Curated annotation (Swiss-Prot):
It comes from the Bacteria. Residues 40-149 form the tRNA-binding domain. Belongs to the phenylalanyl-tRNA synthetase beta subunit family. Type 1 subfamily. This is Phenylalanine--tRNA ligase beta subunit. It comes from Leptospira borgpetersenii serovar Hardjo-bovis (strain JB197). The keyword Nucleotide-binding applies. Mg(2+) binds at residues 462, 468, 471-472. Signal peptide: none annotated. NCBIfam families: pheT_bact (TIGR00472). PANTHER family: PHENYLALANINE--TRNA LIGASE BETA SUBUNIT (PTHR10947:SF0), PHENYLALANYL-TRNA SYNTHETASE BETA CHAIN AND LEUCINE-RICH REPEAT-CONTAINING PROTEIN 47 (PTHR10947).
Amino acid sequence: MKLSLDWMNDFTPLKEVGLDVILKKIAVSVCEIDGVVPFRPELDFVKIVRIESLDKHPSADKLQIAEVFDGSSKSQIVTGATNVKVGDLVPLAIPGAKLGDREILESELRGVKSSGMFCSEKELSLSEESSGVWILNGIEGAEIGKTIRSFLYYEDIIFEIDNKSITHRPDLWSHFGFARELASQLRLPITFNPFESLWNFDLSMKFPRVLENQNAHSYYASSICEVFVIPSKRKFQSRLQKCGIRVINNVVDVSNYVMLEMGQPTHFFDKRFLESQGGVSLEVSYAKKGESFALLDETSPSLEEEILLIRNQGRPVAVAGVMGGKESAVQNNTTEIVMESAVFAREKIRKSIRSTGIRSDSSVRYEKGLEATTTLPVIRRALNLLKENGCPSLKASEPVGFLHTPHKEVRIHTDIHFINTKLGITLSQGDITDILERLHFMVSWKGDRLEALVPKFRHNYDVTIPEDLVEEIGRTRGYDTIQVTPLLAEIKTPIRNLSRELERKCKTFFSVGLGYHEVYNYSFQALKENELDGDVELSVKIRNEMPEEQSVLRNSLISSLLKNIRTNQDRFSEIKIFEFGRAYFNIPEPDNEKKFFSFAVSFDRKSSESDLGLLEDDFLKVRKEIESFLKYIRIFEYFWDIKPEIFFHPGASLSLIVDSKQIGNLGYVHPAVLDSFELKKRVIYGSLEFEKLVEIWNTNRNISRFNVPSQFPEAEIDISILIGEKENTNLFTDLVRREKIPELQEGWVYSQFAGGSVPVGKRSVSYRFRLVNYEKTFTQERIKEISDHLVALAGKNGFVLR
């Protein structure tokens, strides 16, 4: 948001204080400042001069030599302008001026000295097009010797305020509101209050009809006649331009001017158009689904039922608090208007912004929550400004409408001990009273007990509890004046947070050790995405009004990770990501919220890839990574069980079992799910239930499993057998483990194969077993003996050797 120092000076004498003092106080006690810049300082080097004489250039037919007077001295200018004559007042850029990327220098043109350049409005960046030098004859304020910056009311300092730092302060979203705050902080008087403007309404005028309902906090309208639509005066134009608002005409400009000055949006309708619909009868009501009409920005959005509209005779003429309709807008030939001043519930405006995608200056203020009692004072102020800005004889009917939220009182009770304890300093009752009264609170004391009546422009959402009073006192006094007190605390060994420790181990292992990238996602998603993993009836719906794609809390992390892969699938050939996140269920505590460690891998395999060998190799690679992680966190006793999941491919889905509990799963995402997420490559997804993982890790972490390395060479035995397509590969390794062969250290699957010479419905699985002897070197006889044992074991249990 941009604020003009010159404009704020209308309300309190800020220029008497000094810019450095103002900036420091804003930064310490009010909000963050993004920038402080003089407005168009380059125009100080462009002066208004009078052309005293014009002569032809001796060496160029298209050039003229002009002698000009700036009020104190004369100078010579060579110009090619054809629209100038003797006696004209024109802008002259003197040597040293910088206009855009051009610097004006004293030069010679065809042997004749030229001390500057006549300027057009386009060259001064005041207009996109111009037809020659800007002629200022007869324009109010155009005086010889005056700079163009002064002539245009551009001599000003602009404060660029960080909007995020005043989101909770709707009273600061205006020049008067900000000036009022600075006056309180700097002990300055309020010299003019626009909310106290007066106006004599014409009681004989026919007033508009306003249908009362509960769809607005406050809504008033007034008919205005004898309006003349002309360009705004320089003062109005300059102030709007300095705040980044496009100048349109004197009527529309006043509406924008009032909004920037007082923080209250207004709207003007062309009364002639409203009467053409059967008379002026305004109503605040909701849109019908699919309803549409043309807006001022030339769009015609299809409206939802939650959007609030302004209707005349039942027909939409504006999206309430957001934007007016094109047909009812003020035209160049408009002579009668209807002024609207209203306050709508901030929640309703937020819905309209979200649904239409339109974020106007008005809606930004409405969504913060405005004080409803300001609607009538704003009408009186706007009428005074219209009269000043080109409509000297206008008349207005008495406003009609309703106010459903009359002024309420918010009283906060606390005591001096509470305030001093929170701030960490000792303030007297007088100190506290002085600060709060400067901030427009009404204060009374009963002993050490304080009662503060909150000013109406702060009581809606801002100051409501004792802690808010403490903040007001602290920031006004200045947090920089409060001494830092060292924290007094016992030195104790911190309690170990096992969950956090294991989470760090997981992140380190997967990111540093395996090359995964961590991602962060919101917990909001669409209801249909919860169908992937569980009963949608158990979905936790978000009570706030949210779009459909963010209407529930997720019940697993799979949708979030698949969307991450979709976003990145065209940028990387291989994607490996993981996330720590929570899933939510509409069931009693403590099972209503669970934390998961989930991961997804997308190798460079198209979703239509049919080479089972490649797919199995990828799957085994990821499975081996998970097993190495389990070993890293000292979980050695586990097995994989075949268990289908609705989001996994039916032939590639495993459950991880530890201590007879399922703690996770792993599998290829089902092709139908890949298609629904528009994924082009195969995806392997896995998830571990983190609380269970922490519990098992806590049990195992202190158990020593260290084995002294053998000084003798290790040996390996490979064996390949046929098993069913859906048979668990752990069956054979479990059989071998139960044989308790002394030298057997571990065994695992290192390859699988199906098709070719392998019978239909079967697959060839190759196992590798590592042998370690701590007493002597392996002999060929002992290795063969163990190998024969394994072959016999396979045959005994119905497995066919390959």
